[in-house]
């Protein structure tokens, strides 16, 4: 096959297989992470990681998806495109917090959203716009107010619950507990 990543030399084969297995297992349990996140978590040199990611993509064990400035990695065939879009946003701290806030406070106006964050209103506005463009949240006009809510609450909540360990965020743990109490 032309363009395939060359086979590793005999002496490094065991090391390569072990690294590849670690990378694949990490992506399976933490879908949607980007290159640098994977590199930091697994402590594998960047060049080595890129080599193995290309290899796993070419073998169609994982898929790579462009997300703005990032390439995110997912296990092949296990996550649909809608869920990839959700995970892409949930892997970013501010959009994740906005989504969790809106799941617990549907139909909130921008002021209510912004006052619950330490980031500037312009930063929150940027991320709200990003979530609107990705169609994960919607806005509706009620009188003079614009109200925001999550389009598919069940899917977003399911992704948060399913992959909560991959976010390393105590707010996600709190959210999962609260959501589970409200939606038994």
Which sequence ranges carry the predicted segments?
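Short, charge-rich, low-complexity alpha-helical interaction segments
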Residues: 63-71
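Acidic/histidine-enriched, beta-strand-rich ligand/metal-binding domains
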Residues: 94-95, 116
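Short hinge/loop at the helix->beta-strand junction immediately C-terminal to the helix-turn-helix recognition helix
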Residues: 60-61, 136
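A short acidic, leucine-rich amphipathic alpha-helix
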Residues: 37-41, 112-116
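Long, low-complexity, charge-rich intrinsically disordered regions
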Residues: 1-18, 22-29, 37, 44, ...
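Short amphipathic alpha-helical boundary/capping segments
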Residues: 8-15, 83-91
